[in-house]
Amino acid sequence: MPLGYAIPVPLFHYGAFQPLWQQPGLIQAGPAMGTPPNVEALVAALQQRGFDRRAVLLHYIDPFMLRSAPLRGLRQWHGPRLLACGDLHHGNSPIETLAAYLEAEPHDAVLLTFNPALVVEVRKRLRVPVRSLPPTFFRYPSAVPVERPLLQLLHVGSLGPHHPRRRELVAGLQTRGRLPFRHVSTSSPEEAAALYAQHALVLNVPLNHDLNHRFFEVMAAGVPQVVFGDPGLVGEHRALAERPDVFWASSLEELEELVLGLFAEPDWLRAISVPPPPYWELKDLLKAAFAP
């Protein structure tokens, strides 16, 4: 456990303030700091609020931001530095991008937020402890499933140019017409949670080796899901793949047969227990991340 872990922990990220991420001991920093982001400005802003730079810095980033607007000056942070990296399926050579950044801006440990399947590969490239402890510091909107959910397979997500696999699968389901199927796009996790709660089953199509937010969003909404992919996406977290509310399919035909079988027993499907996501308390997350 690093010195200073009990001091309130700044979470540096690039997005808007996220109320769901808040928990005791965490303060969000970064969205209003301007560009380019640097630790000197971060320290100055935090010291105005009485924070100590010996605290743990939780730095959330992805390969796109590492290339376009990386946080600089990490050596000026006097406490432990934990980098939480998401979206390691984005861009060209994302692992090399991460390794090059860490050579220039050292951190004491790395968390892969949604890429447990890539832990072994990333460890080979980095000199610091690397783990994946999903869903890290994230939290998701909860929902109460309706009493009589729609017997439709719901897919929520983008089908844009960066998502050809999803687009192909959705088009295949729509063209074949064997399943009652609905595809929608949403503008917020809260909107998605409300939709999940109205349906008996959700289709989750991860990208490459990314477990994705949707895996946990659906759990938080209390609805079973079918993941189109390999259970190896969970890495060493086998319990996630073996949950009673998570089903797996690796082909369009297998998906259709699985869903038709589940919809043939609607009472059994509705009775499936859906435990909440395995959320981490902040102190426990830091302890696990910094373990030798």
Q: What do these predicted regions represent?
A:
Residues 256, 263-292:
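A charged, aromatic-enriched C-terminal amphipathic alpha-helix characteristic of glycosyltransferases
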